[in-house]
């Protein structure tokens, strides 16, 4: 399958390295690709819990059980560390798109030996724009949820629910963040617990909203 065909069929894209710094290429890529139908998932450990244009930033990609595409904007050293950790965890490995500057001979050797499909030497954004590539079957926009540690002294967990596109600049300790799709499929502890609280006849979105604190 060609890159163009694959990208048109792809629905979710994890932008590894996309944080709040608007000068960074990963952040700009997120902005440049808006409107092309992809469910873009920004990943940045320091800025996790805040949002880019109403989309929550994840601290890592582990919430996704079956990701489709990682577009990586990291140094070669950090890229290789991420890939090794992912493979060792025995998770389903997505297609890896190495942005210019993220690749190295060691990374390419690792990917080839592991049999992981990948692209290198080409910018994902430029490839999509020059070839007019968009997602053929976009996913619907969904709510997102957040669990933080209370800062009022009791150290309790605080669960919040946000409609699609809601912006937030987080200033509290993060416990978990993700959208409704992550909440539905993640094997992490907090999503599993929230799913266990679903009542008969209640959707997961309704459960997440019922458990949330009222908006301030």
Label each residue range with its predicted role:
Residues 1-53, 58:
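Hydrophobic, well-ordered beta-alpha structural blocks that scaffold small-molecule cofactor pockets
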Residues 12, 68-69, 95:
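Structural motif
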Residues 15, 71-72, 98:
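Redox-cofactor binding/interface segments in oxidoreductases and associated redox assembly factors
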Residues 45-47, 63, 99-103, 122-127:
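Short, acidic/turn-prone active-site loops that include or flank metal/cofactor-
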Residues 50-83:
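Glycine-rich, highly charged phosphate/nucleotide-binding loops
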Residues 87-114:
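ADP-ribose/adenylate-binding Rossmann-like module
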Residues 108-157:
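Short, glycine-/small-residue-rich phosphate/pyrophosphate-handling segment
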Residues 138-203:
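Conserved anion/nucleotide-ligand pocket segment
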